[in-house]
Amino acid sequence: DLSARSAIYTKADIVILCLPDQAAAEAAEVIGDKCRVIDASTAHRTHKDWTYGLPELTSTQRQRIAGADKVSNPGCYPQGYLLLVRPLIEEGILSAETLLRCNALSGYSGGGKAMISKLEKTPCNDEGMISRIYGLNLDHKHVSEMQIHSGSQVRPIFIPTVCSFYRGMTIQISLFSSELNGHQAKDVYDCLHKRYENESFIKVIPFGSSKPLTDDFLNPLGCNETNEMELMVFGNREQIHLIARYDNLVKGAAGSAIQNLNIMLGCDENIGLI
């Protein structure tokens, strides 16, 4: 009932929309200027009238979120990509014209109710369900968000994989040193470390550290049930590999919404988050 919803919106300070894209767009239309809103759907993430809700994106993003009436919560996949790529473009380590390639792993909870229902009916020992690559038309719905908010002039190639575990995520970007305008892997680390050294939820792992690895393997579940994102730089003189690891349900979704809610209300950003 739209009239009932409208009455509820009028009484609220902030509404968080957790709806499919079309329903979120319709709800936002009903809300109008009745209250402030955070939209967790894809509907408004590249809309010019909405503020993008990734506080760590730039030095001024928090201030923009704090004063915004309409905030679009970022997508799970784009967050890691953006926090790895944007500083490198801003600092001139990467050109905005660089052709970027990104692979990602996610727990199946990222696919929503339909995927969760489908995959939980399939035994995890089914070899065909261990991992599933998708987005092979190279037009995943997050690609525009990844390009626009990174400052890139070109759409990245983005290939995600849904895995048999419920939650957890890694974003991976491979680069050649020849693409870095004379810079090396350590320069990439230094750039990311400088950008995020004072952030509560972004942790840049020391360059060359094996601490995140277990028997030389990286577990994509390593940040689960926290709002923390770990950024890692691996490489040699010729090649660099960037990784972001986080929980797709927390930092990748609900945790970011709580972060934005805290900022918009003028509260301590860390309240309700670990």
At which residue positions do the language-model features occur?
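Residue-level signal for short, function-critical loop segments
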Residues: 76, 179, 248
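N-terminal Rossmann-like NAD(P) cofactor-binding subdomain of oxidoreductases
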Residues: 1-129, 134, 234-236, 271-273
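Predominant activation on well-ordered alpha-helical scaffold segments within soluble catalytic domains
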Residues: 82-89, 143-147, 189, 193, ...
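Loop/helix-junction capping segments adjacent to catalytic residues or to phosphate/diphosphate-binding pockets
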Residues: 78-82, 182, 251-252
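NAD(P)-dependent Rossmann-like dehydrogenase/reductase catalytic/cofactor-binding core
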Residues: 228-274
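C-terminal substrate-binding/catalytic lobe of Rossmann-fold NAD(P)-dependent oxidoreductases
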Residues: 1-6, 98-99, 103, 108-242
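Active-site catalytic microenvironments for nucleophilic, acid-base chemistry
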Residues: 87-91, 176-179, 260-267
